[in-house]
């Protein structure tokens, strides 16, 4: 037996990218279903490295997005896709501002300004550090992904997003060269679910 779920947008993955995609799709007026192969909030994104980098008013006034893009591409051996690198660099300041608006906390100086540091591979000081959520020890690692995911999960839960945990993608459903949904396995109930979606996002 199998079940059918209809949705405007199907998001596959519950990490940072998946949560942000679900938020955006919902805010644009779509019905959204997110399937997560484990539990929401327990993805690879939770173990994000110690800092995030973005050009903005918090950093060096001489820094530019062009400089950040050169650093990103050159230290990646020019293997990165330039269009994606450009999007990452240009969107990062707005995403940092958005996370701050949603309640994320940064390491700060005594005067209250965001504490910055100059990380390896960067031409300018552009690295910000999220404060870990309570209970995460600094000597174990800052793990800002926990802090970021807490914020994103709260935003997802505050919206009418249908989150389905422990559901694993089996295959995409394709008709005439277009993806029209997916087939997934509900691991708790051992039931196949067919998702009919106008758009499917692999996040």
List each model region and its residues.
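Short, hydrophobic/aliphatic alpha-helical segments
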Residues: 29-41, 198-201
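Secondary-structure transition/capping motifs at alpha-helix termini
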Residues: 26-33, 158-162, 188-191
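N-terminal Rossmann-like FAD-binding beta1-loop-alpha1 element of flavoenzymes
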Residues: 9-34
